Amino acid sequence: MKVLILVLLAVVILQAAPIRKLEDLLPTRYPPDHELVYWCTYANQCDFCWECVHGICRNRIQADWPVIHQNDWIINCTVSRWNGICSYYEGPRNHTDHQMDCANPTSHTYPHREYMKIYERDDL
């Protein structure tokens, strides 16, 4: 019986998906494209989350977000990851550094609609 339990335990351990450690990310203003969903969920004011053409901006990740006028709400950000800690720096104007556990992220920016300057068709 003990042998059977040990064999079953070994099979479960061998078949378990390995826990993948996230690679460290040096500070950058341009995170990898495959990480944009993550970063733009928690740092939604960052300029790399928005595509602006002729002063009109669309969120690159969140299709349900409103189209907005390019304005000071969109900021330059630097993101990084080191030993499981993700951080984003809102600067140089705000000089605010946010840190969070990469596995348990929290947003520090909020879509304050009054600051977003939502684009309306009547603006043409």
UniProtKB/Swiss-Prot annotation:
The keyword Thylakoid does not apply. Belongs to the asfivirus MGF 110 family. It comes from the Viruses. Plays a role in virus cell tropism, and may be required for efficient virus replication in macrophages. It comes from African swine fever virus (isolate Tick/Malawi/Lil 20-1/1983) (ASFV). This is Protein MGF 110-8L. Glycans are attached at residues 76, 94. InterPro entries: ASFV_fam_110. Keywords: Glycoprotein, Signal. The lineage of its organism: Viruses, Varidnaviria, Bamfordvirae, Nucleocytoviricota, Pokkesviricetes. Residues 1-16 form the signal peptide.
